[in-house]
């Protein structure tokens, strides 16, 4: 048997403050916040977009409370999101939202060809790349 994965369903981001992170991803990137309680007293905040989601895990959570990778650090992620919006419109939106544009628009290499990317950081310092294919 050979195995070939086909898509990313979700990922977990370790954050200092779930509310601050969720509000930023809602306001800046237009994601939908969904809060669930998989077991009594254990709330999980997820940010939904397209067919994916990001679970926001508080860095203070223990492995028993929320099983995750061995190294837990907020602000260590580097994520690229795709959009159909024009790159300059993305940069303008970020600035209008009070978010500093670190770089871009600039051409980069994406998984399926050339993308035009705009870079910023989320409240924890993770690098956020917002891109569109040429």
Q: For each predicted feature, which ranges?
A:
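Short, conserved charged micro-motifs
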Residues: 20, 86-91
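Vicinal oxygen chelate
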Residues: 2-4, 46, 91-134
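N-terminal beta-strand motif that seeds the catalytic metal site of vicinal oxygen chelate
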Residues: 1-20, 77-79, 133-134
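Helix-adjacent hinge/juxtasegments
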Residues: 69-73, 77
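A short, acidic/glycine-rich surface segment
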Residues: 62-67, 103-104
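Core segments of cupin and vicinal oxygen chelate
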Residues: 13-61
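Exposed loop/turn and edge beta-strand positions of beta-sandwich/beta-sheet ligand-binding modules
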Residues: 43, 75, 114
């Amino acid at each position: 048997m050979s195995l070939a994965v086909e898509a990313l369903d979700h990922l977990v981001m370790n954050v200092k403050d779930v509310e601050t992170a969720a509000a930023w991803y809602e306001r800046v990137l237009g994601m939908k916040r969904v809060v669930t309680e998989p077991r009594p007293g254990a709330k999980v905040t997820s940010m939904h977009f397209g067919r994916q989601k990001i679970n926001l895990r508080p860095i203070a959570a223990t492995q028993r409370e929320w099983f995750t990778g061995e190294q837990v650090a907020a602000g260590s992620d580097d994520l690229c999101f795709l959009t159909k919006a024009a790159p300059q419109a993305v940069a303008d939106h970020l600035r209008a939202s009070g978010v500093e544009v670190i770089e871009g628009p600039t051409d980069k290499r994406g998984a399926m060809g050339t993308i035009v990317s705009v870079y910023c950081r989320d409240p924890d310092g993770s690098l956020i790349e917002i891109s569109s294919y040429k």
